[in-house]
Amino acid sequence: MPRAFLVKKPCVSTCKRNWSELPDEERGEIYVPVSLGFCPPQPYREPEPSVAEPPSCPLALNMSLRDSSYSMAPGPCVVAQLPSEDMGHLTDPQSRDHGFLRTKMKVTLGDSPSGDLFTCRVCQKAFTYQRMLNRHMKCHNDVKRHLCTYCGKGFNDTFDLKRHVRTHTGVRPYKCSLCDKAFTQRCSLESHLKKIHGVQQKYAYKERRAKLYVCEECGCTSESQEGHVLHLKEHHPDSPLLRKTSKKVAVALQNTVTSLLQGSPHL
């Protein structure tokens, strides 16, 4: 685990609750004050002299009786909560010494419209958008709907399956323009450009990047869906991907014609 993800301040309380890190390389990180949850008791250490406050948490009552200098923020003892506007006072320097453990928590980049975070109830990972949380919840499903035809490994998302299959086929569609490296994911290429070549991406968080259509048979890339279909028809006419892609093109064409007819009643 990188040292940047480790706890920055030792826990002075009898219990704590850590947050899990999100592995996505495109996600930023913020500090979040974590209130007390459950964990094994820590060995007693002589605290520094400070003004004592009577803790209202039952878990900290024994420590308060043993050491009159122990201080803790007033309020009920609850599990770790999400950062919100009413918890803003806990992020100032004075609140850091009131029995709260500051851990490093990774969240997705960008600002959510309401300023709130959406948290997974299973693993406590936080996301700035509901759609990201919905996609994450699939990883907690025991039933794996999408199976790899090479090794039989199951996945809950077609994107994860496609990314895994490329480890078998060797398809690396995202190529670095500054060296000979190639990657299976766009985020891996962007991380490579930033760390190795010092190239920072210019696009905004909400800006949609140009989609790249990848042939999973040979790794050929196309900038348009029509060019992707033509490539499949020419080089892989028996591929099951051709039938699936042709259906998508037909549906998109039908939707375009329908929208044009609705917008032009004289046609």
Swiss-Prot record:
InterPro entries per the UniProt record, alphabetical: Ovo-like, Znf_C2H2_sf, Znf_C2H2_type
GO CC annotations, alphabetized: nucleus
Tissue and organ distribution: Expressed in fetal kidney, and also in adult pancreas and placenta. Not expressed in intestine, peripheral blood lymphocytes and ovary.
Keywords: DNA-binding, Metal-binding, Nucleus, Repeat, Transcription, Transcription regulation, Zinc, Zinc-finger
GO MF term set: DNA-binding transcription factor activity, RNA polymerase II-specific; DNA-binding transcription repressor activity, RNA polymerase II-specific; RNA polymerase II cis-regulatory region sequence-specific DNA binding; sequence-specific double-stranded DNA binding; zinc ion binding
Function: Putative transcription factor. Involved in hair formation and spermatogenesis. May function in the differentiation and/or maintenance of the urogenital system.
UniProt name for this protein: Putative transcription factor Ovo-like 1
